[in-house]
Curated annotation (Swiss-Prot):
Protein's name according to its UniProt entry: UDP-N-acetylmuramate--L-alanine ligase
Any one biological process term the GO annotation gives: cell division
Organism of origin: Acidothermus cellulolyticus (strain ATCC 43068 / DSM 8971 / 11B)
Gene Ontology MF annotations: ATP binding; UDP-N-acetylmuramate-L-alanine ligase activity
GO cellular-component term (any): cytoplasm
Enzyme nomenclature, EC number: 6.3.2.8
Family per record: Belongs to the MurCDEF family.
Broad class of where this protein is predominantly found: cytoplasm
UniProt keyword list: ATP-binding, Cell cycle, Cell division, Cell shape, Cell wall biogenesis/degradation, Cytoplasm, Ligase, Nucleotide-binding, Peptidoglycan synthesis
NCBIfam families per record: murC
Length: 477
């Protein structure tokens, strides 16, 4: 999808006009959730993905007709196609759909169709979208609102990334990667931060800012924008929106924040802090997820939910119950005093935030990290920044880049990234064979250490159980 201001004026298509809908790339976090809501609302759904997964199994159990592999034969009785951004537009299935004149919708257009008619909350930002969206959902659930939601990761068991609730509110993670978040209808918007990313789509940071400006310009009369004033990019977006007359609620640690995080105490098991709104302390929050970044995410959730009229006391209870989303610094197990966590971080800022939190959780133990870069272009663009972020660990195993269908770029390979990590040579290794990574990690870790597997997808997501097996072989015989 190219940059187009008309995107922000697109009207969602009514579900009843879509007919039988086929999701190409249905195994993705965002796609699978939307498919579930389609099914909940009586829309016949089929779908396909490149590999079998627990997500596909859960969709079948929910009533979808799901197959493995891409094949134009899947389109025999289809009225509408929804395409994942992860699936190249040249995929034969999509090419044949267009040849036949079938509507081919981006994921966000399908999401807009299920959000229509609800009081939408759209959570956007370069980092923290999934966790912040999840926190807003948990808080609203504790308040008895039964919101509908679509999130990019499960909150527990497979299929828990989406729900068609009975309440009037729909909470959605808004993906800025291709500007399709401009299709979403909403009452309140959240911008957690704005940094350079997705430079395969955007020309530069200025183009990213322009997209976010158009996104927040969609806040309607009576709605509001919540933005992190601690982040320079989000503050720029908020300032311009305020000058246009948008109601803006800033959050953060800065004295200029309308909803302010104060007295932050980071702990091994999470954090404690107070929240003040317009100068008045609302009360204290206790989180079960670690890191200063998660305290900020929770403050955003407070700003949204209290802004929607819900009581802080119940919001705080909901946030206290939040234990995280899948692959967001998610504990995987422990062997011989060595704990294993898995995380989705795939941008230098995310890696640094996760490793700072992990350092507190490690409580004196060392950090041993396996990282799989995602996309050659991102690795080349941010190689130096990736190196600096990974240097917050004690030992690092860099895997080959996960970039299906892409051509390697100079400076964008796993080997180039490993060379950019400013740690002693023995502390960094490039391992091109993902199946060898578990033994590398097991050999480097010792009791008291914390292992973190990191990356957006591909092979790294398969590692945690294999790492635990390798640790058992080494430490338990």
């Amino acid at each position: 999808m190219t940059s187009d201001q008309s995107l922000s004026h697109h009207e969602p298509l009514p579900l009843e006009r879509l007919g039988r809908t086929h999701f190409v790339g249905v195994g993705g976090g965002g796609m699978s959730g939307i498919a579930r809501i389609f099914l909940s609302r009586g829309v016949p759904v089929s779908g396909c993905d490149a590999r079998e997964s627990r997500v596909l199994a859960a969709l079948r159990a929910f009533g979808a007709r799901v197959t493995v592999g891409h094949d134009p034969a899947h389109l025999s009785d289809v009225d509408t196609v929804v395409a994942s951004t992860a699936v190249p537009p040249t995929t034969p299935e999509l090419a044949v759909a267009r040849e036949r004149g079938l509507p081919v919708l981006p994921r966000a257009a399908a999401l807009a169709s299920v959000m229509a008619g609800r009081r939408g909350v759209a959570v956007a930002g370069t980092h923290g979208k999934t966790t912040t969206t999840s926190m807003v959902v948990r808080a609203l659930q504790r308040c008895g609102a039964d919101p509908s939601f679509a999130i990019g990761a499960d909150l527990g068991e497979p299929g828990s990334n989406a729900h068609d609730g009975t309440g009037s509110i729909f909470v959605a993670e808004a993906d800025e990667s291709d500007e399709s978040f401009l299709l979403l209808p909403f009452h309140a918007a959240v911008v957690t931060n704005v940094e350079a990313d997705h430079l395969n789509h955007y020309a530069d940071l200025a183009a990213i800012h322009a997209a976010f400006d158009r996104f927040v310009a969609k806040v309607p009369d009576g709605g509001f924008l919540v933005a992190c004033t601690d982040d320079p990019g989000a503050e720029e977006i908020a300032s311009r929106a305020a000058r246009r007359g948008t109601v803006v609620r800033r959050y953060g640690t800065s004295p200029r924040a309308d909803v302010r995080l104060v007295d932050l105490r980071l702990e091994v098991a999470g954090s404690r802090f107070a929240v003040a709104m317009d100068g008045t302390v609302l009360g204290e929050l206790q989180l079960r997820v670690p890191g200063a970044h998660n305290a900020l995410n929770a403050t955003a959730a407070v700003a949204v939910t209290v802004g929607l009229g819900f009581p802080f006391s119940e919001v705080a209870e909901g946030l206290a119950d939040f234990t995280g989303a899948r692959r967001r610094f998610q504990p995987q197990g422990e062997v011989a005093g060595i704990r294993v966590f898995d995380d989705y971080a795939h941008h230098p800022t995310e890696i640094a935030a996760t490793l700072r939190a992990a350092r507190v959780v490690a409580d004196g133990g060392r950090l041993v990290v396996a990282f799989q870069p995602h996309h050659y272009y991102r690795t080349a663009d941010f190689r130096t920044e990736f190196g600096a972020a990974l240097a917050l660990a004690d030992e690092v195993v860099v895997m080959e880049v996960y970039a299906p269908g892409e051509t390697p770029l100079p400076g964008g390979t796993g080997a180039a990234l490993a060379a950019a990590v400013p740690l002693p040579g023995s502390a960094v290794v490039f391992e091109p064979s993902w199946s060898a990574v578990p033994e590398h990690l097991a050999a480097r870790a010792r009791p008291g250490d914390l292992i973190v597997t990191m990356g957006a997808g591909g092979d790294v997501a398969l590692l945690p159980p294999l790492v635990l097996d390798a640790l058992r072989r080494r430490w338990q015989g």
